[in-house]
Structures are given as C-alpha cells and as structure tokens.
Amino acid sequence: MNRLRRKACVALLLFTLFIFGTMMGLRTLKPTDGFSDLAPGMELMPLVGERMEQRPNHLIESAGQNGGLHSDTKIVFSNSGPDHSIFYDIHIFYYLWYGSPQMDSSYIHWDHVLVPHWDPKIAASHPKGRHNPPDDIASSYYPELGPYSSRDPEVIESHMAQIEAAAAGVVVLSWYPPGVADEHGKPSEDLVPAVMDAAHKHSIKVAFHLQPYKGRTDISVHDNIKYIIDTYGTHGAFYRFKSSTGKILPLFYVYDSYLTPPETWAELLTIRGSHSLRGTPYDGIFIALIVEERHKQDILAGGFDGMYTYFASNGFSFGSSHQNWKAIKAFCDKNNLLFVPSAGPGYMDTAVRPWNNHNTRNRVNGRYYETSLQAAMSVRPDIITITSFNEWHEGTQIERAVPKKTVARLYLDYKPHQPDHYLELTKKWAEHFSKEKEQWLM
C-alpha cells in the first residue's frame, strides 16, 4: 500500500512539474521577427491592459458633395447598389508620372532606366540600360490596364473606381509645381483638375504629396502651398483635416523633408518664422517624412504637425520598421504631433534597382500587407497611409495586376487570388480600422 502511495505521489509530482513547465514555456514565447500570428480573416483582439483616456486630438473633416464640411470620419452613400463606405482616415499614395505613345508620344516611366549602383564594382555585376515597353516594363508586376498613360481619362476613372472599391477615402497625389517633374518624367501638374473631378465623382478627397525638386526651399514651398490652395482649395474634392485647435485646414505630406534643415522649415512653419504660414489663409497640417531616428527632433524643431513613414519595406529604415512605431507614436503624443504610419503590400524594386534585392519584401499572398496594417493599427493612429496605389517601380502597388509572360519576362502576379485582391484587403482593414476606432473612443 505504501509503495502504491509513493508511486501515486511521484506521478502527481511529475504531472505538476510538467504543467508548470508548459505554462512557463508558453509565457516566455515571443513573436518572431517575421509575420505576426494574425491569421487571414481574423479580427484584431482589443489591446489588453490599454484604455483610451480621452478622444484623439485630431478628427477628420471632409468636404461633402457641395463642398460643405462635416466632422464624420466616413461618408456612407448609395451608388446604384447597396450602401458602402469611404473612410477618410485611410490615405493612399498615388502617382501621375506614367505615359504611353498614344497619349504622350512616347512611354514615360514604364521605360525607366536600370539605375546603376554607386559602387562601380557592384554596378559592373548587374545589367544596364533601360526597359522596352510594352512587353518589358519597369516593374516586377504587370498592370491590368497595360503600360498606361496617366493622361488617359479612362485610366483616371478606372483608378478612382478601384480606390473607391478599396474604401480608401483620400488620394495623396504626388505633386510637382507647374513645369517641373522628376528626372525620369515630364510635368503633369496640369492633370490635377482631371484627377480631382474624377475623385469627386467617387466621393474621394485629394491631398497633396509635395515632392522634392531642384531648388526647393522654404520660400518656394510657401509659393507652392499658396498656389495649391488658391487653385484647388474651393474644389469639392479638396481634403481638409480638423486640427487639435479645432481649425479645419488642408493637409500636406512633405516627401524628403529632411533634405531641408529644421531651422529653415521653422521660418515657414512656426508662428515666429520670417514668412510663416501659421495663422494665414495658407496655413495647413504639414506632415514630414521620418527616415532616421534623429529626424523626430528635427521634425519637431521645424514646426511640422506630424510625421509619416512612407516606405513599405519593414526594416529598411528606422521610420519604416514596425517595431519602432510604438516609440515614435509615444514621441508624437508627448509633443502633440500626428503619427501617420504607412502600410504596404510588399516591396520589390529590382526591375529598376537590380542590386537592391536585400530590401525586397515578398507579399506572401497578402500576409505581409495584413501584418503591416495590423502593426499600423496597433499604435492607434488617427490616419493610416497606404504605400501605394500605383508605384509600380517599387512593387508597392495595390492596383489591379494580371499574369503576364513574354519572350524575355515572366511577371509576378497576385495568384492564387484575383487581380483585385489587395483592393479587397484594403477595404477589409479600412472597415476594421473604423470599428476599432469606435472602441477606442468609448
């Protein structure tokens, strides 16, 4: 009998140790550096142990069909079918730099050069030259519309319809001043009215993504802002945002803002600046690009209202690394700045930078995109930006793409999913973001 009792005690002790060890092992597990445990289709669980103490300082304001302002974050409307929503806290970067022979007399950007590496030894081991559309384009994917022209009204209409289907409420238009373009393109500022008209038709708003150009200074940006507001400020599609002070102001993203010293930006963006926009009819919400960690202080010192991350390659920079977003958001909250994380479906620019495969981020059938969106949402931002609708060179597009094989090229595609897979994922997460925000504000 004693022997049986001893065996029972030993068995009970071993079982207890097993349970204890299992619990400790589970407790010490950490997420991997790769994808999260979010399964496709699963909703985010509420953040445990975190409560929203107050409403956010910033609420979206959008112009209605007649240009009137209201403070809802979304607009629900019927368009010859069931009700659906557009969410003005989802902003998507959009490019107008493409051209085709039919509309522009030649291909523009689809025939992009293969950019050589700055180290001649590395450059020597990679191909040179430029792409030869329509079969060979400067992208690893192939658009359903083919190598199109951004001037084609049917293309613009198709794009706005796709963005509406994705439920993204704000197109962030890559913008250069009249007569100015990037080094591989041609001026396209004259297309802005057509984009705004098409966007308005689909209840989409338009914000401006100020691109760097030769000679860009605080003074030239002052003139750029004045031009944009004077020219487009009364359009029904012109996007405005309600600031923490209650003012309803245009919102501008400033790409490569770090190229200009913070003390120079301060002349434009602080109340005591020599040619300040603050308190004038040309005031706005100005969002700077954060790439390196030190840019946080520079952005604050420059008088900006917030920061965005843009790049869709997790780990490429301090700003684009998901693991840093919580700290960036905390800095922004402390200093009354907006933090606008940028989520993307993947990254692959080897069609234009053949030596840059170490920054490639595969899409994994949409898993990378959902992980990126989850990371953005987890820091409870006011706005999430999507990189991008149609930056085909860097493989960040969510625009419809199709399988394509030529004699020289085999393009990537969205299989096993349909061409609109990333539009559908965007809509799913836009809806989820709206529902999560409602919970945060309770």
Curated annotation (Swiss-Prot):
Top-level EC class: hydrolase
Membrane-topology descriptor: Single-pass type II membrane protein
Transmembrane segments: 9-29
Enzyme Commission number, as recorded: 3.2.1.-
GO cellular component: Golgi membrane
Subcellular localization, as worded in the UniProt entry: Golgi apparatus membrane
Superkingdom of the organism of origin: Eukaryota
Gene3D superfamilies named among the record's database cross-references: Glycosidases
One protein family per Pfam: Glyco_hydro_99
Cytoplasmic side: 1-8
A GO MF label: alpha-mannosidase activity
Lumenal face residues: 30-442
Keywords from the UniProt entry: Golgi apparatus, Hydrolase, Membrane, Signal-anchor, Transmembrane, Transmembrane helix
Family note: Belongs to the glycosyl hydrolase 99 family.
This protein's name: Glycoprotein endo-alpha-1,2-mannosidase-like protein
Organism: Danio rerio (Zebrafish)
